[in-house]
Regions:
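Short hydrophobic alpha-helices and adjacent helix-cap/hinge residues
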Residues: 1-318
């Protein structure tokens, strides 16, 4: 433990020292939520603090919620790039793509991007190129396991609707992966791309009784209540991509917690502020993948949760 603390202190010291005597570094934060403080923001703060970097002394966070509005995300990204920020932190693929279209020079670190190569954000994982790096949430790689967990929790499911945003290229790739593994799991996959909340609600209302639902990444940015309320009403067998949804009432999720990803990405942020180039920093994969279940929802829906799933679960919400 002492060695870890010493290593973090040595890592952060040059940046803190450089910040003395001049204005703190400015980090623009663009995220999908409705309020400034969301899990990715809190995760970023925690990660920077663990590195010994203090808000106010070493850096400031200029936070821009986009309320699920892609056009607003583009506007905020363009304004931040022109304002002289030292780095932009982007949550979600579509926000990261908006930032990339706004600037080719301001460094960007992303989180909650399922497949950054498929999304066109980086040239490759080991050699990102350009002004971009970040933490991949592995949407494509985790899709087979998500379907396996869906089948384990809801064994009667035979048909699964994969609903994703039409502009989210990572989710499109995950939908193709779902098709590839469907035969092995004896499932029929129906992939549907949507663009608006109305599209999403309309699509979900066409689910047949007993149909399963898979959301490989965020479908509609910042509106979890819509999909969760509909799930509870229709008693869908559904699996989500992060524990955030389970905490809000979903039955089960498998994937990386966004606050953990943001804390992990803080190391990349610090390295860039120290002078390293994003193109030289390989894209990292989420280092925390967890299975989470919500027992209250399980009880409300009358689901018999397999003992193996309860034992395997990393997080259980009572």
């Amino acid at each position: 433990m002492c060695l870890v603390v010493l290593a973090l202190a040595l890592f952060a010291a040059p940046l803190a020292a450089d910040a003395q005597g001049k204005p703190p570094y400015r980090i623009g934060v663009v995220h999908t939520g409705f309020v400034p403080n969301t899990p990715p923001v809190e995760g970023l703060r925690a990660g920077l603090k663990a590195l010994g970097l203090q808000e106010g002394r070493d850096l400031t966070l200029d936070i821009h919620p986009t309320k699920g509005d892609l056009q607003l995300a583009q506007t905020e990204a363009t304004a931040l790039a022109a304002s002289g920020v030292d780095l932009i932190f982007a949550e979600s693929e579509r926000i990261a793509r908006a930032v990339k279209s706004a600037t080719q020079t301001v460094p960007m670190v992303f989180v909650q991007v399922g497949d950054p190569v498929a999304a066109g954000l980086v040239t490759s994982v080991p050699h990102p190129g350009g002004n971009v790096t970040g933490v991949s949430s592995l949407a494509t790689e985790l899709t087979p396991k998500r379907l396996e967990f869906l089948k384990a929790v809801f064994p009667s499911v035979r048909r699964v609707r994969v609903v994703y945003h039409a502009d989210d290229l990572s989710s499109g790739a995950a939908a193709h992966t779902a098709q590839d593994v469907a035969g092995r799991l004896k499932l029929k996959i129906v992939a549907r791309a949507v663009r608006t909340e109305a599209d999403l609600v309309s699509e979900l209302k066409t689910l047949r009784p007993g149909d399963g639902l898979l959301s490989p990444t965020t479908v509609m940015m910042g509106i979890p209540g819509t999909i969760l309320d509909l799930q509870l009403m229709a008693r869908w067998p559904a699996i989500f991509y992060t524990s955030f949804w389970v905490q809000g009432g979903a039955v089960v999720a498998y994937g990386s917690p966004v606050d953990h990803d943001a804390a992990q990405a803080a190391r990349l942020v610090a390295r860039i502020l120290r002078g390293e180039r994003p193109q030289d920093l390989p894209v990292e994969s989420s280092n925390t993948i967890e299975l989470s279940i919500n027992l209250k929802t399980v009880t409300a829906l009358g689901i018999t949760m397999p003992a193996a799933i309860r034992t395997r679960a990393d997080r259980i919400f009572p």
